[in-house]
């Protein structure tokens, strides 16, 4: 079910990783299955905490107008999505900067806790911070040196983020246009620790999912969660397979995702029924099978406070599972500790990325869609195989960004990303929701649809923002 495809710029990006740079070799983890579906209708008309914009509970195919000719505004300016009505702000300009820029991955929170700043990384692995109209808050030259891996915002302080350096977890505090580094904890038992792909700070803002090990060669990984307030490191899972702990992924582990109860889902590099295959939940004692055949996943709490994960689950992902959606392949919200209990979130979806920071006070998940079929409409205008969108080749939810209420009761379709996702992995929107659910941030290469990527810029894309609450 999962195919792992590399960016077109993978060889160069891999080289950067090996020097502690950009973690952009992130592999696509997705389903290509497209069986027949039956319509799944959202069940309530009035929704508490309804978004500010978007089209609710609509199951019609909407082709984006001016797909071939649309040009987004300059950095800092905005436009209204012509189909769904949400206002979209452009935050970056790869052509002007001479480098592609991304908010990174859907399961990470790019927005600060006070909704004032955005963390962005360029294709060379350099992080920087902007405001909500793309103005530079902290330039690349003032950011601290970090290990390979991610940079994570604090859960409450909008001026604080975390990163790793050597075998230490570090705190960065923004002061004007500079950053003051300070030590959170040194893991003396390891040569290197990493905040790898996919994993964000915990919902309660206290805990990190990490791994540690040797910085050179290939050895077992120690995968664990660390609570910085209690200064408690949970019992690590020590892998039987091996890879370099200083890198963000390898032939052993593809990534890790922290759960809402501060445990960790380990996404092993290979699918299958073996112990170190698929997605396995490490609770400090045992490895629990969540998926043998994996797909894009994120975690949080349901409205009753139960830890959940959002993914497609059925007998193809784990023997004995049933999918609650009419089509049998829909996105579901599944209880982490009772995986037979699930509700349908969305049916008939294309390939997706999901982002959830939620609980009862923030019940919305952001979902973005992409397609890499060739020929097709999600290619640059001048690329071989490009086809203008039509009723023949444009699918339900294609290229869209939407919000789904975690109890399955409502869908709000926000915008077309207008990204030509078939061009590369980093052209996929990877929409991410802010911790408080007020903003959605996504990537798009829409500015280059007519011309293709500028010379010297690989996987060209820019970052865009939608306010939804």
What are these regions (language model features)?
Residues 145-221, 233-248:
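Asp-box/WD-like beta-propeller blade repeats and closely related beta-sheet repeat scaffolds
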Residues 427-469:
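Blade-level signature of beta-propeller repeat domains, shared across WD40, Kelch, NHL, RCC1
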Residues 340-419:
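Loop/turn-rich, solvent-exposed surfaces of beta-rich toroidal or solenoidal domains
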Residues 55-90:
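Blade/loop signatures of beta-propeller domains
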Residues 98, 105-107, 122-166:
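Blade-loop segments of beta-propeller domains
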Residues 108-117, 122, 149-159, 164, ...:
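Blade-terminus and WD-like Trp-Asp/Gly-His loop motifs, strongest in beta-propeller folds
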Residues 125-129, 167-173, 216-225, 272-282, ...:
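Structural motif
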Residues 97-104, 189-195, 243-252, 350-351, ...:
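Short glycine-/Asp-/Thr-/Trp-enriched loop segments that recur within the blades
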């Amino acid at each position: 079910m999962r195919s792992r495809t590399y960016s077109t710029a993978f060889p160069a990006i891999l080289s950067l990783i090996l020097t502690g740079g950009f973690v952009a070799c992130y592999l696509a983890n997705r389903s290509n299955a497209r069986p027949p579906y039956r319509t799944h209708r959202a069940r309530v008309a009035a929704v508490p905490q309804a978004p500010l914009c978007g089209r609710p509970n609509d199951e019609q195919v909407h082709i984006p107008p001016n797909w071939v000719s649309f040009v987004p505004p300059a950095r800092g300016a905005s436009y209204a999505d012509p189909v769904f009505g949400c206002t979209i702000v452009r935050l970056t300009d790869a052509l002007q900067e001479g480098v592609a820029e991304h908010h990174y991955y859907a399961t990470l929170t790019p927005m600060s806790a006070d909704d004032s700043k955005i963390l962005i990384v360029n294709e060379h692995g350099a992080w920087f911070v902007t405001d909500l109209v793309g103005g530079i808050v902290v330039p690349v030259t003032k950011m601290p040196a970090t290990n390979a891996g991610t940079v994570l915002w604090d859960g409450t302080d909008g001026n604080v983020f975390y990163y790793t350096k050597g075998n230490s977890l570090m705190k960065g505090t923004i002061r004007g246009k500079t950053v003051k580094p300070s030590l959170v904890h040194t893991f003396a038992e390891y040569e290197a620790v990493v905040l790898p792909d996919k994993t964000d700070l915990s919902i309660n803002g206290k805990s990190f999912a990490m791994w540690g090990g040797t910085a050179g060669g290939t050895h077992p990984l120690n995968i664990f969660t660390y609570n910085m307030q209690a200064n408690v490191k949970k019992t690590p899972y020590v892998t039987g397979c091996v890879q370099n702990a200083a890198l963000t992924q390898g032939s052993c582990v593809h990534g890790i995702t922290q759960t809402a109860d501060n445990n960790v889902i380990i996404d092993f590099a290979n699918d299958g029924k073996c112990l170190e295959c698929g997605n396995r939940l490490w609770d400090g004692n045992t490895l629990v099978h969540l998926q043998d055949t994996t797909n894009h996943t994120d975690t949080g709490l349901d409205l009753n406070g139960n830890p959940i994960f959002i993914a497609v689950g059925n007998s193809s992902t784990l023997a004995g599972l049933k999918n609650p959606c009419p089509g049998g392949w829909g996105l579901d919200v599944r209880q982490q500790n009772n995986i037979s209990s699930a509700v349908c979130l969305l049916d008939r979806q294309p390939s997706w990325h999901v982002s959830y920071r939620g609980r009862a006070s923030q019940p919305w998940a952001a979902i973005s869609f992409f397609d890499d079929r060739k020929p097709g409409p999600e290619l640059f205008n001048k690329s071989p195989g490009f086809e203008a969108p039509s009723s023949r080749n444009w699918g339900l939810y294609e290229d869209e960004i939407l919000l789904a209420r975690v109890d399955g009761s409502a869908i709000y379709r926000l915008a077309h990303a207008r990204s030509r996702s078939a061009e590369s992995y980093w052209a996929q929107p990877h929409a991410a929701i802010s911790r408080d659910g007020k903003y959605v941030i996504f990537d798009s290469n829409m500015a280059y649809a007519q011309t293709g990527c500028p010379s010297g810029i690989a996987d060209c894309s820019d970052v865009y923002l939608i306010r939804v609450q």
